[in-house]
Every structure is written in C-alpha cells, then in structure tokens.
Amino acid sequence: MKIKSIVLSFFLVIFFSVYAFAGDPATGGTGLTVAVAANVQYTFEEIKAAFEKNTGIVITPVTGSSGKFTAQIENGAPFDVFLSADMDYPQTLEKEGFTYNSPKVYGYGTLVIWTMTGVDLSRGIEGLTDSAVKKIAIATPKTAPYGRQAVNAFKHYNVYSQVQNKLVYGESIAQTNQFVTTKAADVGITAKSIVLAPNMKDQGKWVEINKEAYDTIAQGVVILKHAQKDHSEEAQKFFDFLFSNEAQGIFKKYGYELPVKAQP
C-alpha cells in the first residue's frame, strides 16, 4: 500500500509540474492543458500543430478515457479544456458547476472492427461469434463511450451473450488499440479516426459497423472553470478554433462526421 501511495504521489508531482511549467504566467507560459479523449489522439496532433502555428499558444494534451477525466476534473485536476468522446460527461460537469461554457459537439464518431490477424471481417459483428475469434478488445464501457457503444452494437445484432466471454477491456480506446496492434486480441472495436491515422492506416484491415447498431456518438468539447484563473482568453481561442474550417477539415480527414453548421 505504501509503495502504491509513493508511485501515485510521484506521478501526481510530475503531472502538476508539467502543468505549472506550461501555464504559469510567472514562468512566461501561455499554455493550455487539454484533456483529450483517446479516440481523438491522432487527430489532435494535427489540431494542436495547426493551432500552435496560428496563435503561438502552446498546448499540453493529456490522453485518456472520458469517464476517468470527468472523475479527475471533479476532484480538482487542472485541465483548461475537455474534449470528450460523448456529450454526457461534459454535460454532467456543466450541471455540477465545473464548466465555464456549455458543451458543443465538435464531431460525430464511427465504430469500426479492426484486426491485424487473418480473421474474416466480411460478416461484420456477426462474424465475431466464430470459434476462430478468441478475444475481442473493447474500451471499458463504464468509463469509455466507445466501449458502451460497442456493447450496444453487439446487443443490436443479438450476439452479446455469444461474445461476452471473449471480451477483453482496455482502459480507453488507446489501450484497446494496443491489444489489436500487438495481436493480444484477434479483433478490436475502435474508432474510425484511429484506423485513418497516417501511422495506422496501412496496418491490418477494418470494416465500419452499421451506424444503426449503436447510438450516435456525438463528441463534445467544453471550457472548464479552471481556465478562468490564467487562461480564459487562450481557452476561448482554442474552443473557437475547433469549429474553424481548418480544424473541422482535420476532423473530417480522420473520419468524423461534422456538425451541420461546421461543414468546411
């Protein structure tokens, strides 16, 4: 128990030190710390580069599951902006008084089945009941919206009871992807934005899951009250940038469907 406490304290010190260096006006920093849902990880690299080039404002992204970020924000984590994998988590934070503005949808996500093995994907989700498929990776449904929608898709096709014992859970989409790329799982249910990333698009094979099989994945962004301490102007600039033609074009490139008014 003592070792665990020491390790946790160590990582907290590192996190807060990085944050302080990036954003403390006393050090001349003008940075933003942004909580980024794991499905946006690769997309965000281009968003970050474009924003920093346009404004000179430095962004420090932290990637993880939306549910865990929400819990961290509720417990005082110093994030300025939160890009969630759904609207539920940022709306919850708004109701609890942790946000500066109301959440806004920046894009709509798509589920895909992805494999690095010889598994036949021609039958889609129904094919995952085959005995050749031993392990199926999904993000943890409790904290990851993409994991919840994967379960909804299984239930839509009436195969959940047949695949339930095959499921292995990643803490977020990022760990789910690791299970796929290392072949620790035969297939994984992940985000289309991942398989379209430049460093992933030629790896393995994938198919989309029919959107009628799961709830619409509306992904929201919100400015958090913490930003008002030192970075209100920078946070607003970044929030607005996400809905610019340039940023929305990047989201589209990575397979996100765009809000109607944000079509570039």
Model-derived regions: residue spans:
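Bacterial N-terminal signal peptides
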Residues: 9-19
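Exported/periplasmic ABC-transporter solute-binding proteins
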Residues: 3, 21-54, 58-62, 67, ...
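Short, glycine-/small- and polar/acidic-enriched structural segments
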Residues: 103-111
